[in-house]
Swiss-Prot record, chain A:
Residue span, Toprim domain: 80-176
Alphabetically ordered keywords of this record: DNA damage, DNA recombination, DNA repair, Metal-binding, Zinc, Zinc-finger
One example GO MF annotation: DNA binding
GO biological process: DNA recombination; DNA repair
Lineage: Bacteria, Bacillati, Bacillota, Bacilli, Lactobacillales
Official protein name in the record: Recombination protein RecR
Length: 199, 374
């Protein structure tokens, strides 16, 4: 026996989401049948609106409703520093910290030829034009992940930016705050010892 | 350390086995297909929770039974540690001192073993890739930094090769990114080469001693790290890094032509030399065997140096491959030092005379009998 077409289609749609297989998708689909009518309408609207109403900021590349985005438009932010991150989720993490008040630049990925991402495929060219145009920027903070690809991307950006005389910095590596040395893996410890600072 | 007792239940062709071993040389004597190697395998399994012969644990459980158990007690300097592994179709659990270990990685290391099987000859005879794999395995066990750098190196290498291929189709592509990848590769590569040379020196020192003894001082074994980087450039990581960078620059055009990275530790090799001649090309079968054996036996001393305890040595069908004098010297080299398990189909005259108080076990269809020698 087959499922009726509407639910089969719904299962199929859920399966397009990452991390959801056939069984989870079926469970979700049947759950949707029992949901309040209003909730379902809200859900459907939210799905459509997320794609329709969001675009990428023409300055920093972050997702936004208005172009340029709130952060780029905010004059109270420190115009001297730009923090470069891999994707928009990283901007949110940094913002939740509430201690960084500068600008952002979102790369939408890292350099990885294996995944078909070369220098032209991520948002680097826009960063360079931005630095050329905007003379207020004095520091580029590179906050790509501590993976080989993240490191390569950081090195690549620093090579392109440094000749212009703008300061390029990289986030620190090492122990995570509040963790026990006992539970840290050996490479993290090694990096932490290597990157120790004078007191 | 040595393995004092071993108990098998439904393991391979052993239905139930309880046996006590001697701390010296234990000879497992039997005809073909009686279960000699199965017994060695069970000891290897007790040490490392996996088999050297198969990746499927199901193969280890006797036919028509559902679960197997391997247990034993390990005598260390002052303590006796009981070990136990239970194996069923659902998986396995390991116990140290009757306490279940939540992770197998916590269990491994209680009993250290070194296995020498006829296949190990390929360290000498085989392709450079076999030797690289061997040194990566050995040195990775001793240094987590080495393990980290080789993992990073592999991943950067893949990216770099892919990018070079892309540049072939698009010659005007970004060269700065290639520079970045080259520098990254050189940085990890330099750490790897530096550590390889350091570890090889240690291994060479111990191998030479063993080799000298087996060959009665007639032959001298030495190692040579084969790399486009000359040895006078290799005394610090900074120098190796600079040398690798220069090589990448020099090879760039050729690399773009061939579409891959042409220098680096992933292409280096180790040459085993006996009396300054390359054993893998000019050595006799016996010399090759002796070299492989010396390298393996050197691991015993290296492990003692690193962990403070001698491991247990498992020799699978090695005696039959060596001539009488090499047998004699092998046995003297290990006598009174490490607990050794030797499988063989017959105990030749020389070996029998030489081994002091050997424990000889006759194996017949999965049943063990300790034979009382006069």
């Amino acid at each position: 026996m087959q499922y009726p077409e509407p639910i089969a289609k719904l299962i199929d749609s859920f399966m397009k989401l990452p991390g959801i297989g056939y069984k989870t998708a079926t469970r979700l689909a049947f759950f949707t049948l029992d949901m309040e009518k209003d909730d379902v309408t809200e859900f459907a609207k939210a799905l459509i609106s997320a794609q329709r109403d969001l675009s990428f900021c023409s300055i920093c590349g972050n997702i936004t409703e208005d172009d340029p985005c709130d952060i780029c438009q905010d004059p109270s932010r420190d115009q001297k520093a730009v923090l470069v991150v891999e994707d928009s989720k990283d901007v949110m993490s940094m913002e939740q910290m509430k201690e960084y008040h500068g600008l952002y630049h979102v790369l939408h990925g890292v350099l990885s030829p294996m995944d078909g991402k070369g220098p032209e495929d991520i948002n680097i060219a826009a960063l360079l034009t931005r630095l050329q145009k905007n003379e207020a920027i004095k520091e580029v903070i590179i906050a790509t992940n501590a993976t080989p690809e993240g490191e390569a991307t950081a090195m690549y950006i620093s090579r392109l930016v440094k000749p212009s005389g703008i300061k390029v910095t990289r986030l620190a590596h090492g122990l995570s705050v509040g963790s026990d040395i006992e539970y840290a893996d050996q490479m993290t410890l090694y990096k932490a010892v290597e990157g120790r600072t004078e007191m | 350390m040595y393995l004092k007792t071993l108990e098998l239940h439904n393991f391979r062709n052993y239905a139930d086995l309880v046996v006590e071993f001697g701390s010296g040389i234990n000879v497992l004597l039997g005809e073909n297909a009686q279960g000699k190697t199965n017994l060695l395998e069970s000891i290897y399994f007790l040490a490392l929770t996996r088999s050297h012969r198969t990746n499927s644990d199901r193969d280890l459980i006797s036919w028509k039974t559902k679960a197997a158990r391997v247990s034993g007690s390990v005598q260390k300097e002052h303590t006796v540690t009981p070990l136990e592994i239970n194996l069923s179709s659902k998986g396995k659990n390991a116990k140290v001192n009757h306490l279940e270990q939540s992770r197998l990685s916590q269990y491994v290391g209680q009993l250290n073993v070194i296995l020498f099987a006829p296949e190990d000859l390929s360290i000498v005879k085989g392709s450079p890739a076999v030797r690289r794999k061997f040194i990566d395995m050995e040195f990775g066990q001793m240094s987590s930094k080495y393990l980290y750098n080789s993992a990073q190196y592999r991943s950067v290498l893949k990216q770099r090769n892919q990018y070079i291929k892309q540049l072939q189709f698009n010659p005007k592509g970004d060269q700065v990114y290639l520079d970045v990848l080259s520098d990254q590769l050189a940085a990890h590569g330099a750490e790897i080469i530096f550590q390889r040379i350091q570890f090889l020196k240690k291994l060479e020192k111990w191998s030479q001693e063993v080799h000298k003894e087996i060959s009665q001082g007639k032959e001298k074994l030495s190692f040579q790290y084969v790399s486009p980087i000359s040895s006078n450039q290799a005394d610090t990581t900074e120098k190796i890094y600079a040398a690798l960078q220069a090589l990448f620059q020099k090879q760039r055009e050729k690399e773009l032509q061939q579409g891959k990275t042409l220098v680096g530790p992933h292409l280096d090799d180790v040459r085993f030399m006996v009396n300054d001649k390359n054993v893998s090309t000019f050595g006799s079968q016996g010399q090759q065997r002796t070299t492989a054996l010396s390298v393996k036996l050197a691991e015993i001393d290296l492990m003692k140096e690193e962990t403070g305890e001698y491991p247990v040595l498992l020799l699978d069908d090695v005696l039959s491959e060596l001539d009488d004098s090499r047998q004699t010297h092998l046995l003297t080299a290990i006598q009174n030092k490490v607990q050794t398990f030797i499988t063989t189909t017959s105990l030749s005259g020389v070996a029998q005379q030489l081994i002091n108080e050997p424990h000889v076990f006759n194996i017949d269809h999965g049943v063990l009998m300790q034979s009382k020698e006069e």
